[in-house]
Amino acid sequence: MQYKKTLVASALAATTLAAYAPSEPWSTLTPTATYSGGVTDYASTFGIAVQPISTTSSASSAATTASSKAKRAASQIGDGQVQAATTTASVSTKSSAAAVSQIGDGQIQATTKTTAAASLKLVMVKIQATTKTTAAAVSQIGDGQVQATTKTTAAAVSQITDGQVQATTKTTQAASQVSDGQVQATSATSASAAATSTDPVDAVSCKTSGTLEMNLKGGILTDGKGRIGSIVANRQFQFDGPPPQAGAIYAAGWSITPDGNLAIGDNDVFYQCLSGTFYNLYDEHIGSQCTPVHLEAIDLIDC
């Protein structure tokens, strides 16, 4: 009997080794592989725009059309979630992008409809932004979650106060962040952050109150509130802490690829999964309502 109990305890311990426990150094929660040529330190504050990955068009044709496409930026609501909208909106140029918004809990969200205005504010915390190549910014809600919209142009992802990231189903221009932590975005070009041959970021978006703002240093991603960008136990991308949420899988190992996309480890493909009127963002395919996307990095400017 004692032997069986020991085996069960050992099995349970093994399943938790890959996840974060509060007593452990969270900065070691990093994938084993790294993205070739990825930048782990970026000097400027930036946002992200959700770019759907077409399974029918070639990579070369996608590259050809990228500069002319309006992109959706993610917003963040107060809890840290990141969200993106589901529709597209017309935006300005460097390639201008509507920013993803963030709500107060850290979630990131993006809208689902196509409007030229900034993504809607959530009661938590949203972030809005636009432009360089025009893209709708992803929003973040107060809990740190990140969400994004469902359509192909400039809608912004938001983050709510708990750190989750969500995106709406329509395209809006930029993501802004409201007092409760939600993030919404709008669009504009930046004169200060001109792209160079070594700068992987070639899109810009207007920064407004509530825009999901991120910094990348040493492979660690933080939002405007200093919360840690992580992949949590359910594979969702959101911001928490510090320290990150107990059970987090990755809290370091972030980079910007040579193509200007956000990556965790050697992976730059994320999934937007429909949750009501917003998409939540994940690093793995978790269900039938999930589609592959790139999270394009966008410079944020005051407009």
Curated annotation (Swiss-Prot):
Main location class? secreted
Task: Please give the PROSITE patterns that the UniProt record associates with this protein.
Answer: PIR_REPEAT_1, PIR_REPEAT_2
Q: Localized where?
A: Secreted, Cell wall
PTM (free text): Covalently linked to beta-1,3-glucan of the inner cell wall layer via an alkali-sensitive ester linkage between the gamma-carboxyl group of glutamic acids, arising from specific glutamines within the PIR1/2/3 repeats, and hydroxyl groups of glucoses of beta-1,3-glucan chains. The propeptide is cleaved off in the late Golgi. While both peptides are secreted, only a fraction of the mature glycoprotein is incorporated into the cell wall.
Q: Name one GO molecular function term.
A: structural constituent of cell wall
Q: Where is this site: Covalent attachment to cell wall glycan?
A: 81, 107, 145, 164, 182
**Biological process GO terms, please?**
fungal-type cell wall organization
Q: Where is this site: Cleavage?
A: 72-73
Q: Which residues form the propeptide?
A: 19-72
Signal peptide coordinates? 1-18
Per the record, what is one GO cellular component? extracellular region
Alphabetically list the UniProt keywords.
Cell wall, Cell wall biogenesis/degradation, Cleavage on pair of basic residues, Glycoprotein, Repeat, Secreted, Signal, Stress response
Q: This protein's superkingdom?
A: Eukaryota
The reply on keyword Acetylation is: no
Q: Where are the transmembrane segments?
A: none
Q: Where are the PIR1/2/3 repeats?
A: 71-89, 97-113, 114-134, 135-153, 154-171, 172-190
**InterPro entries this protein is in?**
PIR1-like_C (IPR054508), Yeast_CWMannoprotein_PIR (IPR051153), Yeast_PIR_rpt (IPR000420)
Q: What is the documented function of this protein?
A: Component of the outer cell wall layer. Required for stability of the cell wall and for optimal growth. Required for resistance against several antifungal and cell wall-perturbing agents and for tolerance to heat shock.
Which PANTHER family does the entry mention? CELL WALL MANNOPROTEIN CIS3-RELATED
Record's comment describing the protein's domains: The PIR1/2/3 repeats are required for the covalent linkage to the cell wall. Their number varies among different strains of S.cerevisiae.
Q: Which family does it belong to?
A: Belongs to the PIR protein family.
Entry protein name: Cell wall mannoprotein HSP150
Question: Could you tell me which species this protein originates from?
Answer: Saccharomyces cerevisiae (strain AWRI1631) (Baker's yeast)
Tell me what gene encodes this. HSP150
